[in-house]
Amino acid sequence: MKFQSTLLLAAAAGSALAVPHGPGHKKRASVFEWFGSNESGAEFGTNIPGVWGTDYIFPDPSAISTLIDKGMNFFRVQFMMERLLPDSMTGSYDEEYLANLTTVIKAVTDGGAHALVDPHNYGRYNGEIISSTSDFQTFWENLAGQYKDNDLVMFDTNNEYHDMDQDLVLNLNQAAINGIRAAGATSQYIFVEGNSWTGAWTWVDVNDNMKNLTDPEDKIVYEMHQYLDSDGSGTSETCVSETIGKERVTEATQWLKDNKKVGFIGEYAGGSNDVCRSAVSGMLEYMANNTDVWKGASWWAAGPWWGDYIFSMEPPDGTAYTGMLDILEAYL
């Protein structure tokens, strides 16, 4: 999400197998290929490298299992590059951090769901814009090599590039694609993100050059994010209107069609209120009517430290888990 509030949260929340009940939408066969939630926690905290369990946390496999049981088949798993690679992007791994990340990914894929590996770094490393496409390609060749034999793993080049040279964003995404394929990861999809926080509502104006990306395996997915508050930052539980969800993805939908691409909403959310429920439902229904270009969507976000966060999808009592999941269930 645009506002990096995840870095400041440290309220603990448990997990269980309880599920919410509420006024439901009619269940139907899923029209999306992938539909699920983000799994946040390993990117929390401002201390680098920080202490596991104090500054950051890894997602709870039992909570992931609960969401899989509800029908989710996709989880975007956040991590911080500086914790995985404390010395340099091309350096050695912190083995404990890598092992914990792999445990989460394995929990997802062992449950038959897809895991999207998400370096949640905003196009930056140690606070500086990533400028070396060579180093970025090596980073991705090394990381993809860890998971190249798991067909249920997918790769997200980086979270929410912003305030960067547009050609650099294009070239970093291409370097990531090249590195992933060089690792021998040829079966997995690669999710590319754009500049300006990869917003769907600004995509056409900002990220048109992204259509020039190439992949020898033809498995590029254009990941966009879309929040429904006034500034699109995802910091308010108030949605602009009941129709704002559909409105904010309409132009991007046409861009995907015009350029013969496929897309995915990697982050979206709205408050647990009537206006947002209608706005979220309207966006998803519009996407469901355009599945020739939309592969699916993932809610922001589940994770064990969200506490009473306005968009928490963490079982058993996250605000969105109890207040919004019935809206999403129509698409699971």
Curated annotation (Swiss-Prot):
Chief site of localization = secreted
Catalysed reaction(s) here are:
Endohydrolysis of (1->4)-beta-D-glucosidic linkages in cellulose, lichenin and cereal beta-D-glucans
Instruction: Give EC number(s), comma-separated.
Output: 3.2.1.4
Q: Which residues are glycosylated?
A: 38, 100, 212, 289
Q: Where is the signal peptide?
A: 1-18
What is stated as this protein's family in its record? Belongs to the glycosyl hydrolase 5 (cellulase A) family.
- Please report the name of this protein according to its UniProt entry: Probable endo-beta-1,4-glucanase B
